[in-house]
Every structure is written in structure tokens, then in C-alpha cells.
Amino acid sequence: MVHQVLYRALVSTKWLAESVRAGKVGPGLRVLDASWYSPGTREARKEYLERHVPGASFFDIEECRDKASPYEVMLPSEAGFADYVGSLGISNDTHVVVYDGDDLGSFYAPRVWWMFRVFGHRTVSVLNGGFRNWLKEGHPVTSEPSRPEPAIFKATLNRSLLKTYEQVLENLESKRFQLVDSRAQGRYLGTQPEPDAVGLDSGHIRGSVNMPFMNFLTEDGFEKSPEELRAMFEAKKVDLTKPLIATCRKGVTACHIALAAYLCGKPDVAIYDGSWFEWFHRAPPETWVSQGKGGKA
């Protein structure tokens, strides 16, 4: 593995609270609430308007995506991403801190962390412990929406961090990349249904290894230590010195694998953006495995 200086992928609630208190939130430091919840459960934007980290803007994953794609939350274009984050007051010189309000401590935040990285932005961090621990520790909140001055952001797609359907299909034969699936075990095996999905069976891409993303987090919602994370990869016989593609249902929780590997010193994990949703609808049936109805054991 090539050793290089990696930007801090995590910041603590204490660090962010001190930065907020010191008035540092502005052009040089932007905070994003990247919460998203399944329809019919919680309303992310409504909760943001009720309370959020002072100075934080709402990052709408439903807006910052390729709306023309038939697949879920696919990456927007370079111009689309640049325009969207520029409207949030983010330039190429901004340190971005992302959090979400999920009960696990982190769910969508690593996806937004990866989006910034795939578009060439190095100075981006996830709030370790998320909004859950921000509230638990008694840090300040506000209902006042953030109105940052628009900024200019130049996006440059780093294609090495992104994999397409065609590349993953080719990898089934070449086996150049290890493939790791971050979904819960039942969905990976095909014994439990995909939530909120019509016409989408559960199962996995042939040859992939299962590492459920929630296992990377402690019960308190913090990221596990690099030592613990390395042991988890080793237990699954995932070699962090070799190329790795992460997948899930729609390219969101796969980013937890990229974050965990980054914390272990591996910054080059690629995400299969279309993930299982695209694979199920496009790939030949012999390329996927499911123990459920209609699947191949």
C-alpha cells in the first residue's frame, strides 16, 4: 500500500462545537445535515428546520443526484454537483463537515463524504457520532435556516473512485477487484426483502463478500477504531493492500466500507454507484445469488 497523508475523515462533536462557538462556520468551514429517511418514517427536511447544528445547511440527496437515471440516487454530473454545493456556500477551499440524524449515529453522511471526494474535494469530514451524539452531549442547536453566500466550486470527477455496471460485470471474469456488500446479511443472502422496494428481489452479486455497514459502528454510534476495523476486514479475508469495490443497494451504505477502509489507511476504495438496484435489473440472472424466491442458491 502506498503511504500518503490522508485528510482527517472524522471530526469529533467536541471539535465541531468549539468551531461553532468560535464563529468559524463560514466560507472556510461549512456544516451539512445530510439526513434522509425511508418514506413514511421521518421527514429529514422538517427535522432540519426544527433543529440542527448552528450554521448547518441541509444537503438534499434527492436534489443532488442524476434525476434522469432510472436507478436510485446516482451521482449527478460534475456541473450539477458544482452548482448544488456552490449554492450551499462551498468552494474548493472549504472544509466540509457532514452529519445525519440517523439513530445508528451515521447513515447517509458517508455517502456525501464520498461524493465530495469523488468530485475532487479533499477537505471533507464526517461528524463522528452524528447528530445523535451532538444532542446527547448537550451541544447547541437552532431552528434558524442557514443562508450562506453562494460560492464557486469546481468539480473534477475522480473516476478511480467510481465503478460502473460494465466494469463490475467485467470484474466477474478478471477478478481484479475484491467486491464487498454492505447490506444486512438477510438482504445479502436473499432471505429478507429489500425495504420499500417494488420489483426488487434481495440477493447479491456473485463473488461478493458481506460486511454489514452497521457493524462498523459502536452501540453508541461512533466509528470503531482502525484496529477494530482492520480486524473486521481480516476476518472476512478482505485484503486492504489490494483493489476493492464496495456495493450495497443503491450506493449509499457502501460508502461506509470506503470510510472504514480510509480510516485503515486505504483511500482508494471504489463505489459501484448503481449497486444491487441496477445489477438486479440489468445483469444476467446467473451473475447474482439469492436464497429467496426466484433466486439462485
From Swiss-Prot:
CDD domains hit by this protein: TST_Repeats
GO terms, molecular function: 3-mercaptopyruvate sulfurtransferase activity; 5S rRNA binding; thiosulfate-cyanide sulfurtransferase activity
Tissue expression from the record: Expressed in numerous tissues.
Enzyme Commission code: 2.8.1.1
Residue(s) carrying N6-acetyllysine: K14, K136, K163, K175, K224, K236, K237
Gene Ontology terms describing biological process: rRNA import into mitochondrion; rRNA transport
UniProt modified residues of type Phosphoserine: S38
Entry keyword set: Acetylation, Glycoprotein, Mitochondrion, Phosphoprotein, Repeat, RNA-binding, Transferase
Effect of K250A: No rhodanese activity
UniProt-annotated catalytic positions: C248
The keyword Ligase appears for this protein: no
Region (Hinge), start-end ranges: 144-159
UniProt modified residues of type N6-succinyllysine: K14, K136, K175, K224, K237
Residue ranges of domain Rhodanese in the record: 25-143, 173-288
Chain sites annotated for binding substrate: R187, K250
GO cellular component, one term: mitochondrion
Sugar-modified residues: S35
Domain remarks: Contains two rhodanese domains with different primary structures but with near identical secondary structure conformations suggesting a common evolutionary origin. Only the C-terminal rhodanese domain contains the catalytic cysteine residue.
Record's subunit section: Monomer.
Protein name: Thiosulfate sulfurtransferase
Originating species: Bos taurus (Bovine)
Lineage of origin: Eukaryota, Metazoa, Chordata, Craniata, Vertebrata
